[in-house]
Amino acid sequence: MGSSEQELVAIVRELGCGPYFLGTFDKRFPGFMAPHKLACAIVNTAGRETGGVHWLALAWNPKNRTCYLFDPFGFSDERLKQIYQFEYEGLLKRSALASTPDHCITLIKSTQTVQGPFSAACGLFCCMFLHAFVNWPTSPMERNPTMDLLTGVPNSMLQSPQVVPTLRHNQERLYRFLAQRSPYFQRHCERIKKATAFDQMKNNM
C-alpha cells in the first residue's frame, strides 16, 4: 500500500513545490543537474518494476551548495543499504559534477525518526518536508513552522513502545497539515489514510 506516484505529485504541487519539483523517481534518480536552480524530488529506495518500497525526499539548494536527504525513519547510510540496498553516493557524485565548479557539495541528512515502524506514510512525510524546503531552503529539516509540527525521536528507539504515542501523534499532525493545504488530500482523505495507516505494514505481515 502506501502512496502512489500520482498522489505524491498532486499533493506536492498543491503544497506550492511545483516550480522546483522534478518529480517522483525510483532508485535510479539521476541527481540534480541544474547548477543554479532550487530543486527537489521524491525518490524510492527500490526500482519502479518492484512497485516501490520506501520513499525518501531529496532537495538541492544552490545558494549554500547543499543537498538535503530526508528519510522519515532517519536511518544511517549503512542501514539504508542493509535494509533497502539503497545507496545515494552515485547520485551525489553526479549532482556535484553537474552543479558545482569544484565538484564539492554538502550533504545534510535527517537522523531522527518521525514515522512509526509499521506506518506506510513515508511518501506523505516527504511531501511535508518538501513544503518546508521550498519555504525555508536553508533550514528545511528543523527550526521552521512546518517540520516543527513533528517530534523526532532517536532512530535507535524506532521499535520502542515508549515512542509509539509520539510517532502516532506525528502522523495525526501530518494528516491535519495536508488536509489544511491540499484539496487532493481532502477529496481522497479516507482512501489515503487507509493506505498509509499507522499500522498498515503490520497488517500486511
From Swiss-Prot:
What induces this protein's gene, according to its Swiss-Prot or TrEMBL record? Expressed in the late phase of the viral replicative cycle.
Q: Where in the cell is it found?
A: Virion; Host nucleus
GO CC annotations on file:
host cell nucleus; virion component
GO terms for MF:
cysteine-type endopeptidase activity; DNA binding
Which Enzyme Commission number(s) are on file for it? 3.4.22.39
Q: Is Transcription regulation set as a keyword in this record?
A: no
Where, if anywhere, are coiled coils annotated? none
Q: Name one Pfam family in it.
A: Peptidase_C5
Catalytic site: 54, 71, 122
Q: Which reaction does it catalyse?
A: Cleaves proteins of the adenovirus and its host cell at two consensus sites: -Yaa-Xaa-Gly-Gly-|-Xaa- and -Yaa-Xaa-Gly-Xaa-|-Gly- (in which Yaa is Met, Ile or Leu, and Xaa is any amino acid)
The activity regulation comment is: Requires DNA and protease cofactor for maximal activation. Inside nascent virions, becomes partially activated by binding to the viral DNA, allowing it to cleave the cofactor that binds to the protease and fully activates it. Actin, like the viral protease cofactor, seems to act as a cofactor in the cleavage of cytokeratin 18 and of actin itself.
In this chain, the site described as Cleavage is at: 51-52
Keywords in UniProt for this one?
Autocatalytic cleavage, Disulfide bond, DNA-binding, Host nucleus, Hydrolase, Late protein, Protease, Thiol protease, Virion
Gene Ontology biological-process entries: proteolysis
Task: State the family named in the UniProt similarity comment for this chain.
Answer: Belongs to the peptidase C5 family.
Q: How does this polypeptide assemble, per the annotation?
A: Interacts with protease cofactor pVI-C; this interaction is necessary for protease activation.
Name the HAMAP family on file.
ADV_PRO (MF_04059)
Q: What does this protein do?
A: Cleaves viral precursor proteins (pTP, pIIIa, pVI, pVII, pVIII, and pX) inside newly assembled particles giving rise to mature virions. Protease complexed to its cofactor slides along the viral DNA to specifically locate and cleave the viral precursors. Mature virions have a weakened organization compared to the unmature virions, thereby facilitating subsequent uncoating. Without maturation, the particle lacks infectivity and is unable to uncoat. Late in adenovirus infection, in the cytoplasm, may participate in the cytoskeleton destruction. Cleaves host cell cytoskeletal keratins K7 and K18.
What is this protein identified as? Protease
Which organism is the protein's source? Answer: Human adenovirus F serotype 40
- Supply the source organism's classification: Viruses, Varidnaviria, Bamfordvirae, Preplasmiviricota, Tectiliviricetes
